[in-house]
């Protein structure tokens, strides 16, 4: 008879469930400014310590410290703060619109505004973002018309996508924002392919893509990294580790064993892990990765270490699977508050101006929502049926012609 122990299956479990005290002590958070910043041209094999630490710039006193400090101008910092506040104001008002029956679905970016806004500001015109549904800040930073967002969310007659997408699956090619897809694993593959095409044409444009940490368990993630590595695709591939894939905690995707940034090592590409609630740290990491991509040094995988402070969507109640006050205990704080405190520490901001800006942006959002409501909310106004046949085929084939005839169009 064997003395071997019986095999047992390991099932990862979160540290805290509803009713428990939130606990993030498992995460080692280094001091701001502690991590070295290597030169952009540094070979990948000399960068293998970076995925196991955390790039941080803003300390607890609101000061920007260390080698990753991008030394942004006060104007750039204020623009970043304003865009983050606009994103949050828009989220709050459109979330309420869902509760009022004006839209069928909505998803908020609460707690994750910093990385989308910073990365949108770093990338250049002509670069392409392959987004997930929590990077509304990218469009806000590019000046996308708020009323166009509202019209799509309300699914009304002026929906710029003519009812072809879910309310929050935006598409804005002219703003460097590729069509959002509910098939979240596809983002990396599309971005790598786009970046390879840019390199093949001898262009100077790069791609940036997002997936959530849960999606790293899908095959698309690994296939994209293989192509990115082999062909040195000029791309920045971001894993937004916000701790929760709907109700599945990050450990289900492997966070208990290693970092998501460390997954880059197997493919021979650099991996960075960045404080996703630190606007300056995200800016610096993205700038570094962008310089590598534009220098024909290939892709970089960035783990954006952050926290989803709201529910997954309007269809989700996070209190069913995590402590109700878990967001308050997140050790990296609120990205808006941290950037505000940095500006105050610089003498470039104060609480009065902050309150005035919040009120001003709320009025801007309110005006856009009213304009959309005048066109129509859910079920009150919708695109014409004939528009489902337009903008799809350059030349309609016989099936489309027959379908139009059957509908009397």
Model-derived features with residue positions:
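Cofactor-binding active-site loop characterized by glycine-rich and histidine/acidic residues
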Residues: 89-92, 96-233, 249-256, 261, ...
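Glycine-rich ThDP/TPP pyrophosphate-binding loop and its adjacent helix/strand module
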Residues: 176-374
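Conserved acidic/glycine
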Residues: 1-115, 310, 319, 324-409
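A general structural signal for short secondary-structure junctions and capping/turn motifs
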Residues: 46-48, 119-122, 228, 291-294
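Short secondary-structure boundary/hinge segments and terminal tails
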Residues: 115, 140, 246, 282, ...
């Amino acid at each position: 008879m064997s003395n071997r122990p019986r095999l047992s299956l390991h099932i990862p479990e979160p540290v805290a469930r509803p009713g428990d005290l939130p606990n993030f002590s498992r995460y080692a958070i280094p001091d701001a400014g502690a991590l070295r910043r290597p030169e952009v041209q540094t070979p990948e094999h000399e960068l293998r310590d970076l995925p196991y630490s955390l790039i941080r710039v803003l300390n607890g006193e609101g000061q920007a410290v260390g080698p990753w400090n991008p030394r942004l101008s006060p104007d750039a910092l204020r623009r970043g703060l304003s865009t983050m506040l606009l994103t949050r104001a828009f989220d709050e008002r459109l979330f309420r619109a869902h509760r009022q029956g004006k839209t069928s679905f909505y998803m908020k970016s609460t707690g994750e505004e910093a990385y989308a806004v910073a990365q949108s500001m770093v990338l250049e015109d002509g670069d392409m973002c392959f987004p997930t549904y929590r990077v509304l800040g990218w469009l806000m930073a590019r000046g996308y018309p708020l009323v166009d967002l509202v019209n799509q969310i309300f699914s009304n007659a002026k929906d710029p996508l003519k009812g072809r997408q879910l309310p929050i699956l935006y598409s804005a090619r002219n703003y460097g924002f590729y069509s959002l897809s509910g098939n979240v694993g596809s983002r990396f593959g599309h971005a790598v392919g786009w970046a390879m095409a840019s390199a093949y044409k001898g262009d100077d444009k790069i791609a940036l893509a997002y997936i959530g940490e849960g999606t790293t368990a899908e095959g698309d993630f690994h296939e994209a990294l293989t192509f990115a590595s082999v062909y040195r695709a000029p791309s920045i591939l971001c894993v937004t580790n916000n701790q929760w894939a709907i109700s599945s905690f990050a450990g289900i995707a492997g966070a208990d064993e290693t970092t998501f940034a460390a997954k880059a090592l197997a493919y021979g590409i650099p991996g960075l892990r960045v404080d996703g609630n630190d606007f300056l740290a995200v800016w610096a990491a993205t700038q570094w990765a962008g310089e590598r991509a534009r220098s024909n040094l290939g892709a970089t995988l960035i783990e954006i270490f952050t926290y989803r402070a709201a529910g997954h969507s309007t269809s989700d109640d996070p209190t069913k699977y995590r402590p109700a006050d878990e967001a308050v205990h997140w050790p990296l704080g609120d990205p808006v508050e941290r950037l505000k405190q940095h500006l105050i520490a610089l003498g470039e901001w104060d609480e009065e101006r902050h309150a005035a800006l919040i009120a001003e942006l709320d009025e801007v959002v309110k005006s856009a929502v009213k304009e959309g409501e005048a066109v129509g909310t859910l079920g009150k106004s919708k695109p014409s049926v004939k528009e489902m046949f337009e903008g799809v085929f350059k030349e309609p084939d016989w099936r489309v012609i027959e379908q139009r005839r059957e509908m009397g169009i």
